[in-house]
Amino acid sequence: PEKEIEFKYPLFDFPYLNSIIEEHNLHRVRLMNLKSKTCYSYHKDQGKRFHIPIITNENCFFVVDEEIKRFPADGNYYILDTDKKHTAINASWYDRIHLIGNL
């Protein structure tokens, strides 16, 4: 049966994004902007993160257990295991934006 979702505020009515959230059973979904020339601390979280790169370039990357990983904005999604030590680095002159959700 088709499930209809009603939103109290039209701001949250994004059929395409909502279909991705539902299809992958994501929670705590957010748009994350990593400012140019910044990085996060090297840390661990719990669980896996679903990433859809929206705006990025070759100077934006992750370091996961001392291995560099790049997620291009090619329309695909990527899974990051945040149980491992990791950081995100933006060494470019432009902000990086990802849609991120917890799995």
What residue spans do the PLM features occupy?
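Residues in well-ordered beta-strands of folded domains
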Residues: 30-32, 53, 63, 89, ...
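A short beta-strand-loop-beta hairpin characteristic of the jelly-roll/cupin
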Residues: 53-73
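Short, conserved beta-strand element in jelly-roll/cupin
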Residues: 33, 44-60
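Short beta-strand His + acidic residue motifs that chelate non-heme Fe in jelly-roll/DSBH
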Residues: 40-43, 60-62, 71, 80-92, ...
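Short beta-strand-initiation
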Residues: 37, 47-49, 83
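Residues that flank catalytic or metal-binding motifs in active/ligand-binding sites
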Residues: 27, 46-48, 95
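Signature of the catalytic double-stranded beta-helix
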Residues: 1-34
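A short hydrophobic beta-strand segment most commonly corresponding to one strand
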Residues: 50-53, 77-79, 93-103
